[in-house]
Amino acid sequence: MTERLSLAEARSIAIAAAGFDRPRPAKPGLSHARAVIHRLGLIQLDFVNVLLPAHYQVLFSRLGPYHRRLLDHLVYRRREFTEQWAHEASIIPVAMWPLLRHRMAEHRARPWGFDRVMEEHADWVATVLDEVRARGPLEAASIEHPGVTASCFDHAWFRSVPRAVLEAYFGRGLLAIAHRHENMARFYDLAERVIPAEHLARQVDPAGARRELIRIAARALGIATIADLADYFRMFVRDAHRPVAELAAAGEIIPVRVEGWREPAWLAAGAKPAKRLTAAALLSPFDPLIWFRPRIERLFGFEHRFEIFTPAEKRRWGVYVLPFLMGDRLVARVDLKSDRTARRLCVLASWKEDGIHVPVVAEALAAELRTLAAWLDLEKVTVARKGDFARQLAAAVRGAAPCAPNHPTALARAPENESSTPPPSVPPSCIRSPSASRRKDR
């Protein structure tokens, strides 16, 4: 008989699997950063610097203030991790390189249409690899431009032909990223000079690789539909059916039904609800817990869109919006920007979710904003008037202290379609009645 889980149990399992089931360490070090990446299986790279590059935020959400060089040291000095296309451009354990080789063999050059340009200039393209072999590691600016122009660059986020060629070789696994400049520019080198020989030589057939990727995804997600599992490594759902069936037959994932979910779900063996969830964390738009919109809506009833590329007049929430996780709920969202010249963390807009205990959430969010600002070497948090949470948050920011590890529940009432019995992370006495919520928080 298929096991049934409440939505609260599923949410607790997912949050725990994502690494929010324990307090932040007092002094985050290499071992903590390493453990987060291994637990998640990958961290998506994104260098949009409205707030800070997103991959650093993913670690901060779980570890609190840490030295950002820890991540760079693990990837580019110790080379325990490396860059490759996984869930988009990502940081992955070097041991995962063989699991992605079948995708490297199928890699298409970017921007779309650049394959044809490479074919038309094959002789010059070959010299780029020769240059890296002779002089690497090299950045794109070190490669002489061939004078080639192509319409495929018209809407690309980079327009360098040498960069596109280096990226094509990287995507195909011939090159790897040796290190990055302070301005984030990549330095490319031959894969055999970056990836340890034991991983470079390991051969994994495509079916075995897909099975292992789904296994990693299942562990990182805790509970997931087949679409959730496939999305983790940007796999077609049709390619996920066989590895899911094999892992189920081996008892590594278990079929379950979740309250309110139309599709069947898969529970990673050993995954279970956390005994207590005390997280208070702002989540990057590229955090694995929230990057797949259908899953975040199923788990949290939270509608989330990344609107940085949306025309201003069509944006609902803002340019760079981070949800705020508190306990087992997403209770608010803020549109953030780092003003490095004025040394301010700017809250451009702030919005609360329905049914929250407003003073408690405002206090916790204000504390987290203060902690984030200090970590970014910003002196002040400012809150603009936009959003239905702005007034309460601004008042809390004025009196905020550093974030405490534990705080009462954010809920003012039980959400719709769920049992009124609180999950293990929520003391029953902290849940307020709907009438009290209307009297004091509205």
Residue ranges of predicted features:
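Long, charged, low-complexity, helical-prone intrinsically disordered regions
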Residues: 1-412, 417, 430, 438-442
